[in-house]
């Protein structure tokens, strides 16, 4: 029994979208998404090599992309991809055994086999039930896959969020297979330890602001110095989790959400505001503006937690857990990129003649034209979501919890557009912004 092919519905084309999405764009997007699904691997290389085609196409579609723009962005992503691996049919027939499935988790060569397994499960049970069983059920398998959802700078959970947001079973299957075949930087240990500590500590009557926890990360020498430049791409595994795992879990455990719908909504908005703030406020005095590559992912993924908390078929306590894990990992990622010094002026005072007059619709139009893998479009769309979700909390009793205020959202979106436009992929962002080394790039000289 095969999963339904991708068929985008005009009524489910994103929670942040333009008013009119061309019908021929839906048709083109369906075709390109199926071609990617059938022909290409989820990973263009075994480590840190995610196929971004789905993310890019669905994001720009929601921002009003034409069929040509969709094809152009597809073409941007194709050169680095590799063919989807062959299905191991012998293993496929055994994956319904939980022990065998558990042993297969983390095997990137089995992506296609896992994809076919999850497509079968979705065809038999429905995509919502498959998510319940394999992500949310709090079994050993579900907790293992849930932790892997947050691996790779949130790529699997972004994929899952898109599958839910656009209500596409095949995209959900891809997300499950991506998480199940993903490598491991041991963030599951961080989640487990933080959750255990939160479970035995007495909850504070007034929650500590996430931005205060960010400041505590920077002030904690054990955590701040844990990632080293020489760790390169393993700063999470070897640095924050490896050298400061206990301290990081203890600090992260302080981000807690009561099982209350309004508290969940506010806390999700707080997470979004905090991520946007440290992404934009982490500049380097005397150098050109540039957004950190990893902090950018904290923002792009944040939109999907707005999607998750709106799913009434997911139990409240499970939606709470999804957001708690996101914020706790955000704190760790802030440390991974060097616990950069933060200053609101970099966002609030941002001005550039090239973009000062641009509104959201102008930015959507501009970013859809960019040769990109979707990161800039995702970032801008997530900021628009943040503006909408956070505005009611930015003044009044929760003001101190929300560092992004008013037009800072639009200014940060303009900064993204200005600093990524017409640049090659390796110069659109800066990696590990809290370290001095990446800021020595010649293109960042004032």
From Swiss-Prot:
Signal peptide: none annotated. One of its GO terms (molecular function) is oxidoreductase activity. The keyword Iron does not apply. Disruption phenotype: Leads to the accumulation of chrysophanol. Coiled coil: none annotated. It comes from the Eukaryota. Its EC number is 1.-.-.-. This is Baeyer-Villiger monooxygenase dmxR6. It comes from Cryptosporiopsis sp. (strain 8999). The lineage of its organism: Eukaryota, Fungi, Dikarya, Ascomycota, Pezizomycotina. The gene is dmxR6.
């Amino acid at each position: 029994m095969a999963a339904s092919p991708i068929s985008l519905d005009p009524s489910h084309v994103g929670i942040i979208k333009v008013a009119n999405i061309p019908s021929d764009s839906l048709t083109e997007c369906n075709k390109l998404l199926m071609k990617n699904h059938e022909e290409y691997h989820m990973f263009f290389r075994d480590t840190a090599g995610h196929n971004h085609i789905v993310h890019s196409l669905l994001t720009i579609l929601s921002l009003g992309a034409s069929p040509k723009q969709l094809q152009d962005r597809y073409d941007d992503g194709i050169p680095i991809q590799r063919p989807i691996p062959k299905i191991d049919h012998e293993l496929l027939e055994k994956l319904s055994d939980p022990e065998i499935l558990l042993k297969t988790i983390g095997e990137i060569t089995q992506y296609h086999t896992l994809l076919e397994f999850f497509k079968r499960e979705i065809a038999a049970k429905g995509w919502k039930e498959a998510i319940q069983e394999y992500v949310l059920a709090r079994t050993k398998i579900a907790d293992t896959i849930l932790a892997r959802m947050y691996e790779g700078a949130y790529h699997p959970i972004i994929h899952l969020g898109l599958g839910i947001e656009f209500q596409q079973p095949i995209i959900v299957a891809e997300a499950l297979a991506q998480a199940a075949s993903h490598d491991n930087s041991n963030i599951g240990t961080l989640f487990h330890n933080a959750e255990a500590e939160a479970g035995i500590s007495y909850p504070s009557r007034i929650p500590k602001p996430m931005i205060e926890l960010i400041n505590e990360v920077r002030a904690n020498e054990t955590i701040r110095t844990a990632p080293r430049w020489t760790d390169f791409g393993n700063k999470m595994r070897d640095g924050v989790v490896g050298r400061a795992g206990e301290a990081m879990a203890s600090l992260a455990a302080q981000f807690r959400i009561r099982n209350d719908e309004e508290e969940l909504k506010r806390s999700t908005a707080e997470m979004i505001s905090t991520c946007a703030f440290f992404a934009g406020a982490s500049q380097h005095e005397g150098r050109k503006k540039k957004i950190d590559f990893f902090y950018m992912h904290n923002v792009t993924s944040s939109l999907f937690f707005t999607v998750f908390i709106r799913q009434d078929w997911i139990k409240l306590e499970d939606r709470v857990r999804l957001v708690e894990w996101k914020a706790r990992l955000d704190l760790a990622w802030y440390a991974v990129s060097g616990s950069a010094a933060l200053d609101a002026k970099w966002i609030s005072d941002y001005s550039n003649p090239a973009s000062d007059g641009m509104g959201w619709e102008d930015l959507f139009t501009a970013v859809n034209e960019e040769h990109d893998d979707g990161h800039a479009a995702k970032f801008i769309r997530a900021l628009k979501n943040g503006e909408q979700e956070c505005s009611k909390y930015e003044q009044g009793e929760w003001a101190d919890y929300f560092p992004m205020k008013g037009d800072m959202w639009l200014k940060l979106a303009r900064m993204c557009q200005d600093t990524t436009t017409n640049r090659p992929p390796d110069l659109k962002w800066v990696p590990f912004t809290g370290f001095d080394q990446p800021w020595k790039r010649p293109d960042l000289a004032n």
